[in-house]
């Protein structure tokens, strides 16, 4: 389902207890609200267009501005205020996830030729 926003529109693709995946269409010279997520990482992958990501740290003010073009990916850590600005009309994929342990696998046997 697509939802209209002042900066374009967002479409929810998938979500579960630890991940959300959205497709966003953003407009040139429009921005989302400055906001933060307490526990979620927020990733942006630009498929087409140009997107500026701004990140703030409470005690330091604006600490980063990253320009993403087609094929670029950037991550905002939990607890950091951020916003995006469309520098050129485009499409991006937005991911939200919680940190997990990559080495949590427990193998019962080894893979190989059968």
Predicted regions, residues:
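A short, N-terminal "cap"/entry segment at the start of jelly-roll beta-barrel domains
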Residues: 1-23, 31-34, 66-70, 109-114
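Double-stranded beta-helix
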Residues: 3, 85-114
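Short, well-structured hydrophobic secondary-structure segments
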Residues: 24-40, 44
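A generic "binding-loop/recognition-motif" signal
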Residues: 30, 39-40, 80, 88, ...
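Glycine- and acidic-residue-biased ligand/ion/polar-headgroup-sensing regions
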Residues: 39-58
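Short acidic-glycine-tyrosine-enriched beta hairpin
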Residues: 57-79
């Amino acid at each position: 389902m697509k939802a209209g926003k002042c900066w374009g529109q967002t479409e929810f693709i998938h979500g579960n207890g630890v991940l959300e995946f959205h497709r966003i269409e953003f407009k040139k010279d429009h921005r989302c609200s400055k906001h933060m997520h307490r526990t979620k990482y927020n990733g942006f992958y630009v498929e087409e267009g140009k997107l500026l990501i701004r990140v703030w740290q409470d005690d330091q003010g604006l600490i980063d501005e990253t320009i993403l073009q087609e094929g670029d990916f950037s991550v905002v850590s939990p607890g950091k205020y951020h916003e995006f600005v469309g520098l050129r009309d485009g499409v991006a994929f937005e991911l939200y996830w919680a940190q997990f342990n990559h080495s949590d696998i427990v193998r019962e046997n080894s893979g190989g030729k059968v």
